[in-house]
Amino acid sequence: MTVVTGSDKTTAATEPFSNGEARGIINTTIDTLSPELRTGDNTIHSNPEEGYEEGLAHKTLTKFLEGRRFAVTRHAYGIDTSFEATFGSGGRQVVFCAEYDALPGIGHACGHNLIATSPLAAFLGAAEVLPKMKVLTQNL
């Protein structure tokens, strides 16, 4: 699970920030990180791990986020394969949930590898655009 946490010290943008500009920043961020996201996705897909046994998937996702200096809590909520990554502090919260377990007998035919990297991409896009929109204060 990834969590984006807002700041109590948010300020409104001094100039209007269009949806098109926001989309452009998000798309550029995701496009830039796409090769690394695909590598993580392929690692998870090629190494299916059933529920509560997703050690490699957990390590792959947390290492990726830690490498980008996000605050990551491994083994969050008393679950060995859960994690929380935060951006900002206090205030509003936006939560992106990721699934990365495989199903018995079919591996990742369920697509959970994609349900891991898609919210990760959304989290990274949000973490890039929100400070530029002055919606969040960046703590990296």
Regions found by a protein language model. Name each.
Residues T2-T137:
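Acidic/His- and Gly-rich active-site-bordering loop/insert found
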Residues L140:
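Active-site rim/loop-helix segments in enzyme catalytic domains that contact anionic ligands
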